[in-house]
């Protein structure tokens, strides 16, 4: 898109490819931190099973009352790249690692092994699972023009459902 826009001398109405990383789960967490935006405690730029397990362990050590965490693929949307992790009763690195094979996946026919393989290729994040009796999931779509003008395209509250309650319906 960028090369074509330059060749034709027209504005690029899309993301410059050099900025694509900001749109990933890891990139978004980093951008939010830099901007001082509150976000769930967690870790980004993870790739391996070991990094996921270490992050889950560190989160539980930081908050012994933590019961669940969410693992998210970097390049996913509509909640389909999210998996819920339930902490085992035993608090040990081995127990936490073993429990990873029991991830509750958003896509019913996928297995934890397939999910973790995708994670190793794509990377992702692990963060504390935020739960409440009443859940909302506001969404906004904005457009930034080539001149830097920001325009709100739409806003809405997303309906969530599916096996993990994280799929946008």
Roles of regions detected by a PLM:
Residues 1-2, 52, 135-137:
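Short, well-ordered alpha-helical microsegments
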Residues 19-123:
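Active-site nucleotide/adenylate-binding loops and adjacent lid/helix of ATP-dependent enzymes
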Residues 1, 124-129:
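Catalytic micro-motifs at enzyme active sites that drive phosphoryl/nucleotidyl and oxygen chemistry
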Residues 1-23, 30:
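ATP-binding N-terminal substructure of ATP-dependent carboxylate-amine bond-forming enzymes
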Residues 4-7, 80-86, 138, 164-168:
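Short acidic, glycine/serine/threonine-rich loops at helix termini
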Residues 91-110, 128, 133, 142-169:
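ATP-dependent carboxylate/phosphate-activation module, predominantly the ATP-grasp catalytic core
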Residues 11, 67-70, 81-82, 123-124, ...:
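Beta-sheet entry/capping signal
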Residues 10-15, 39-42, 123-124, 164-169:
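Glycine- and acidic
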């Amino acid at each position: 898109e960028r090369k074509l826009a330059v060749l034709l001398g027209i504005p690029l109405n899309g993301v410059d490819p050099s900025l694509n990383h900001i749109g990933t789960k890891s990139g978004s967490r980093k951008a939010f931190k830099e901007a001082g935006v509150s976000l769930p405690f967690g870790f980004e730029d993870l790739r391996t099973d070991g990094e996921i397990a270490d992050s889950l362990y560190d989160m539980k050590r930081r908050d012994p009352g933590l019961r669940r965490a969410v693992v998210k693929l970097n390049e996913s949307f509509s909640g389909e790249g999210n998996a819920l992790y339930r902490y085992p009763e035993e608090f040990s690195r081995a127990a936490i690692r073993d429990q990873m094979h029991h991830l509750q996946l958003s896509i019913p026919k996928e297995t934890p092994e397939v999910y973790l393989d995708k994670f190793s290729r794509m990377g992702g994040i692990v963060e504390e699972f935020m739960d409440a009796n009443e859940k909302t999931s506001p969404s906004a779509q904005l457009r930034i023009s080539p001149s830097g003008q920001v325009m709100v395209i739409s806003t809405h509250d997303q309906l969530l459902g599916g096996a993990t309650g994280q799929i946008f319906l």
